[in-house]
Amino acid sequence: QKGYVAVDFYDGSIMYDFSTDVTTICDIDLFKKAPVINDKGVDWFGTKRLKAPEEYMEGCAIDEQTNIFTLGALIFEFFGRFSDEEIHQRYCNNQFIPCTLPNWQLSEESYQVATKAVSLNKSERYLTFAEFWYEWKAANSNF
């Protein structure tokens, strides 16, 4: 909405207080005004566990769809189960891989929404956070 892109957002930026049921976003120190172009190639900011494909390729646009990928990957971290080997492969292959549906803890509908968010093909992802949020809420309306 404000024209900024998060360039270093990951699970370490989120704190949850179980006693108050409050989630806090913290340590968000690197936002850039769009348009943002990856000028570092594979050394672009962020953890390999959650990075979108364009965050490895010099000259690619880093935008809202990139941030949607990161959020989708975070959602998989929270609600998916991964073996140590699967996590290791993300680092070796420079590629986030979602868990399989049997290793997903929420509904199949929410799995489909999260899977679209982390599509390797940027044109297949949600275009906006508003679209992603709408689909996520619809898929999780029973919770």
Language-model features, listed with the residues they occupy:
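Conserved protein kinase catalytic/activation segment
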Residues: S13-I28
